[in-house]
Structures are given as C-alpha cells and as structure tokens.
C-alpha cells in the first residue's frame, strides 16, 4: 500500500517548524509518502525566489533562519499544485488568509483527504463565531482535526521538549496524525473535544495582549498572574457559551489550555508587541512591520472578531478583559486604563 501523501499549507515560522518534524517523520515511517510538499507564498529574497532557496539550501531563510528542513520537504509556490494528490493537509497560515486558500483548493482534492488545522484564530461569520477548522471543513468538505499547544515555533524548531494537544473526533485519524507529528521532544495527547482545543488556541492570544500591556506598564508579576487567571476564566466561560459540543474543564488543563496560555503570556509575539505598544505608543501596524517582518498579530484581530460577536449577543459586560483589549487596540482607550477595566470583574462580584 502506498504511503499517505502529506501537504503543508503554509510556510511561516510555525509552518516551517512543523515541516521539519513532518518531513523527518514522513521520511522515516512506512505509512507516509516520504515526499512532503509545502505551499510557500512566493517572495523575492535578495533577487532569488524563496521556493528556490528552500529547495536548494533546505532552509526558510526569511521565517525560520538557522534551521535546516529535511531535503524531502519540497517548496511549491502554487497551492493547488502542492495539494494535488495529498491524503493529509496540514493548515498553518494566518487565519485571515484561509478563506481565499480554501476557494483555490475547492474541487482539487482527493476524495478521502483529511485536514488538520494548526491555525490559532476565529472567523466572525454572519451567525457569530466560526472556528477556522469549521470554515475549512465546510468549504472543502473534508473532516478536520486541530493541533494546539504551548508551542513557540523557534523552540519547537530547536527541538526543545514540549507538549501539544490534538483534537480529533475519530480515534484512528487521531493516531495517524499523532504518528505524523510526534517526536521524542514534541509529545502529543489526543482528545476528542475539537472545539474546546481550538477555541483555547484562539482566545489565549487576546489574554497575551493583556499580559503584554501589563509588562509595558511595569505592573509586575502579581498583576500579570491575575490577568492570566481572569483571562483563563473568560476563555472557559466563552467556550461554554459558544462551543456546540461538550466543554469539560479538564481540556483546559491540557497543553492547548493553561500551558499554551502561560507560554504565550510570557514568551509569544502577541505579548512582545503589546508590551512595545504600551511602552512606545506606536500603532500595532507599525510594530508588526518593525518586529514581525510584517506578519500579522492574531490577538488584536481575534479580540475584534470576538467583540463583534459579544455585542451581537449582548454579553460584552461579562467579558471585561477581552473587551478592554479590544478597546485599547481599536477604540483609542488609553492603555493605562487597562487594569481599571478589570477591577469590577464578574469573577470578583
């Protein structure tokens, strides 16, 4: 039986870090095709195409410099060509681009293709919240799983020990995806609550922006711990309101929940940029250009999408931390007033 073909849709720093793992495992395990395709948004780097650099030097010099990708990972600039014949699609692009990518892929996939989303964000549809895996699943007609956890891309690429969570309703598919992605230093737990796993990955970025504000304002560890805890409570409350399936508090104790929240509030890019925002007064857009090579920050966008949903449902008052992050980022509320917004939190009433 031929091995399952894998395509990685995306090649930013997280996409490239995952390509390193997937390429290595697919090259080693008989039940995967050793050739892994990776869709790369073509860019010009010093007069050379990024795909050409990746395919000759085996390194994504723009988004994951200093890390060699396995030679069996092949960069392809056309997403349809990259995905042709794939049995497993690994989605890892910024969430605002996923609609356009699905439109391009529609009608070009094999009958039994499955997908896994590593994308942290939510989509705000006409009827409220839509998870990214739902958007992909509906548009492409494929079953979707998710992978979320305390996984800062550079540390995963450096093969430092960490854990992650796969949310998958089908145990056999869950095992297949675990085989594809687990390594001695990238340990995976599979749970069936796909919605809860995914919502953790989206919402923690909002909390991390709040944690960054605390750092930028010089508020110290007690305040930051309170922000993280209140953020976790809002994450759980939001999940219970909006997830269609079961939401058990135990899932928040997996890597996708509290672990991802902690690492993002201490080390992630949302925190770093929010700290600079509080310190310098520069706009988020300006800081994205300066600090992230122009890559988009997920936290503020997710806060905006959530705010629109909460307004629609008349629930803004129940989520003061999420609301404060939105107001500071989009309505010009002074960042110095961030903590005041938390002093009458429903948790304290």
Swiss-Prot record:
It catalyses: sn-glycerol 3-phosphate + NAD(+) = dihydroxyacetone phosphate + NADH + H(+). Substrate binds at residues 120, 269-270. GO terms for molecular function: glycerol-3-phosphate dehydrogenase (NAD+) activity; glycerol-3-phosphate dehydrogenase [NAD(P)+] activity; NAD binding; protein homodimerization activity. NAD(+) binds at residues 10-15, 153, 269, 296, 298. GO terms for biological process: cellular response to cAMP; cellular response to tumor necrosis factor; gluconeogenesis; glyceraldehyde-3-phosphate biosynthetic process; glycerol-3-phosphate catabolic process; glycerol-3-phosphate metabolic process; glycerol-3-phosphate shuttle; positive regulation of glycolytic process. The modification Phosphoserine is found at residue 154. Keywords: Cytoplasm, NAD, Oxidoreductase, Phosphoprotein. The modification N6-succinyllysine is found at residue 289. Belongs to the NAD-dependent glycerol-3-phosphate dehydrogenase family. Its main location: cytoplasm. Has glycerol-3-phosphate dehydrogenase activity. InterPro entries: 6-PGluconate_DH-like_C_sf (IPR008927), 6PGD_dom2 (IPR013328), G3P_DH_NAD-dep (IPR006168), G3P_DH_NAD-dep_C (IPR006109), G3P_DH_NAD-dep_euk (IPR017751), G3P_DH_NAD-dep_N (IPR011128), NAD(P)-bd_dom_sf (IPR036291). It is an enzyme of class 1 (oxidoreductase). Its EC number is 1.1.1.8. GO terms for cellular component: cytosol; mitochondrion. It holds the Pfam family NAD_Gly3P_dh_C. The modification Phosphotyrosine is found at residue 326. It is found in: Cytoplasm. The keyword Translocase does not apply. The active site is at 204 (proton acceptor). This is Glycerol-3-phosphate dehydrogenase [NAD(+)], cytoplasmic. Homodimer.
């Amino acid at each position: 039986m031929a091995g399952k073909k894998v395509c990685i849709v995306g090649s930013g720093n997280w996409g490239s870090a995952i390509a390193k793992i997937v390429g290595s495992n697919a090259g080693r395990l008989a039940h995967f095709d050793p050739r892994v395709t990776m869709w790369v948004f073509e860019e010009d780097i010093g007069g050379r195409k990024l795909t050409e650099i990746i395919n000759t030097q085996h390194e994504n010099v723009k988004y994951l410099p200093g890390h060699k990708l396995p030679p069996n990972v092949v960069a392809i600039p056309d997403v349809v060509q990259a995905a042709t014949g794939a049995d497993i699609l690994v989605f890892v692009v910024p969430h605002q681009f996923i609609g356009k990518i699905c439109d391009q892929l529609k009608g070009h996939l094999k009958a039994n293709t499955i997908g896994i989303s590593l994308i942290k964000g939510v989509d705000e549809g006409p009827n409220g919240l839509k998870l990214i895996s739902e958007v992909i699943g509906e548009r492409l007609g494929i079953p979707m799983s998710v992978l979320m956890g305390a996984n800062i891309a550079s540390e995963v690429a450096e093969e430092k020990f960490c854990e992650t969570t796969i949310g998958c309703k089908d145990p056999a598919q869950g095992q297949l995806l675990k085989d594809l992605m687990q390594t001695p230093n990238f340990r995976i737990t599979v749970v069936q609550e796909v919605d809860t796993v995914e919502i953790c990955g989206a919402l923690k970025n909002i909390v991390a922006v709040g944690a960054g504000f605390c750092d930028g304002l010089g508020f110290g560890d007690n305040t930051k711990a309170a922000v993280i805890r209140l953020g976790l409570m809002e994450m759980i409350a939001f999940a219970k309101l909006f997830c269609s399936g079961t939401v058990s508090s135990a899932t928040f104790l997996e890597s996708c929940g509290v672990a991802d929240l902690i690492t993002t509030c201490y080390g992630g890019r949302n925190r770093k940029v929010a700290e600079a925002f509080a310190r310098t007064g520069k706009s988020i857009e300006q800081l994205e250009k300066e600090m992230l090579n122009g890559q988009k920050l997920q936290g503020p966008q997710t806060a905006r999408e959530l705010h629109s949903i909460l307004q629609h449902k008349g629930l803004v008052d129940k989520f003061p931390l999420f609301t404060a992050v939105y107001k500071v980022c989009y309505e010009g509320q002074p960042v110095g007033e961030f903590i005041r917004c938390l002093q009458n939190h429903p948790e304290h009433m």
